[in-house]
Amino acid sequence: MSWRPQYRCSKFRNVYGKVASRENCYDCIPITKNVHDNHFCAVNPKFLAIVTESAGGGSFFVIPLHQTGRIEPNYPKVCGHQGTVLDIKWNPFIENIIASCSEDTSVRIWEIPDGGLKRNMTEAVLELYGHSRRVGLIEWHPTAINILFSAGYDYKILIWNLDVGEAVKMIDCHTDVILCMSFNTDGSLMATTCKDKKLRVLEPRSGRVLQETTCKNHKVTRVVFFGDMKRLLTTGVSKWNTRQIALWDQEDLSMPVTEEEIDGLSGLLFPFYDVDTHMLYLAGKGDGNIRYYEITAEKPYLTYLMEFRSPAPQKGLGVMPKHGLDVSACEIFRFYKLVTLKNQIEPISMIVPRRSENYQEDIYPMTSGTEPALSPDEWLRGVNKGPVLMSLKEGYRKENKAIYKAPVKEKKSLVVNGIDLLENVPPRTENELLRMFFKQQEEIRRLKEQLSQRDLLVRQLELELKNLRNSPKDS
């Protein structure tokens, strides 16, 4: 019988993080001070987008990826929102299209010129209104082009078909603020976490809840699908107030498959999963560490590999898509770290050390490409398809020919699931909401006072009528 080691040998056990040199970082960026638990950063092979601090509305920078170094204070911004920008996401199939959502209750679609911005951009190619409160999350469908999901503080998820510029579905099964949305590989399933302490697995087209559990010993904040492994991972806090991760079977959420405590820090844990290498990265908000694990279908499921440490705390992290990585350097993942203490964006490359300079096929399998598998109409009809795969062997040289043509919209009511979402224009910020509330309170008080006066007048008239009826008898 041959001898076998008790530990599992992994080709990723020596992966290390390499921080970009100072001249390859992005300096002097006024990163937003908003405390919303998002990354405030989005990146693709062309552009880097960062939500910035601004007065009188929300804005974000869009910087060509090669334009590193110091960013001028008067650098052009995307600044059309009337409230703080809370989330931004690049279209995975059209690299010049970015979506943003804001406290002004809107979702907006922007088209960035190839060379970047030369002046402030204030006009979006499409403005989407449907939420009655601020919109905190947006996600693109992973395989269908121009399908966008938005989650608002009205506890609703709207599904937008950007080809027609309208919400086509509404998911209203949540009873509190939605914290996170994640899709499986083909986008046929969606997992959500919510402030009501529930983890849900949904069929996104119908909004039907397939699995649901209340996490009693594990307060969930973030969730991520493990590709086609039929597993979910959540990050959160244990009943002892320690940061914790839990692995779930997507078809049975009655109890977690396994749980693991991470540390006693208080910052949110952001999970990132690489479906090609089956590696999980855990990055803590407010600290500078990134832990990474290898995921397997059998026990122990999670194998700890190593930890990247940095003294500079991170506010959020953007992630470069696989086709934007440097395969010649054996780079398998790249973060863009928001360092508010330095007003800096710091690229961090995760590298597999190899002596050979040849293409390493074992760490670069076929990966999700930039071609959509489905049109919006096909997906809405119920078709499911996995992503269109591409090879990274020749590097990413493809010129994306896909373009987005915004629909011409007429003013009309927006009816989703039998509910008119635009029957009344919603307040766009929290201050407007408070003003509207106090105005309504004053109007209610005034109406009650008028009603009381009219009740008194009615009683007086009834008494006079009674006296008139009795007067002939007295005569």
Swiss-Prot record:
UniProt cross-references to Gene3D superfamilies, sorted A to Z: YVTN repeat-like/Quinoprotein amine dehydrogenase
Superkingdom field: Eukaryota
Main location: cytoplasm
SMART domains assigned to the protein according to its UniProt record, in alphabetical order: DUF1899, DUF1900, WD40
Keyword Heme assigned: no
GO CC annotation: cytoplasm; cytoskeleton
UniProt keywords, alphabetically: Actin-binding, Coiled coil, Cytoplasm, Cytoskeleton, Repeat, WD repeat
Xref: PROSITE patterns: WD_REPEATS_1, WD_REPEATS_2, WD_REPEATS_REGION
A GO molecular function held by the record: actin filament binding
Subcellular location: Cytoplasm, Cytoskeleton
Coiled coil: 431-470
Repeat region (WD), residues: 80-120, 130-172, 174-212, 215-258, 260-303
Pfam families referenced in this protein's UniProt entry, alphabetically: DUF1899, WD40, WD40_4
Function of the protein: May play a role in the reorganization of neuronal actin structure.
Family the UniProt entry places it in: Belongs to the WD repeat coronin family.
The protein's name in its UniProt record: Coronin-2B
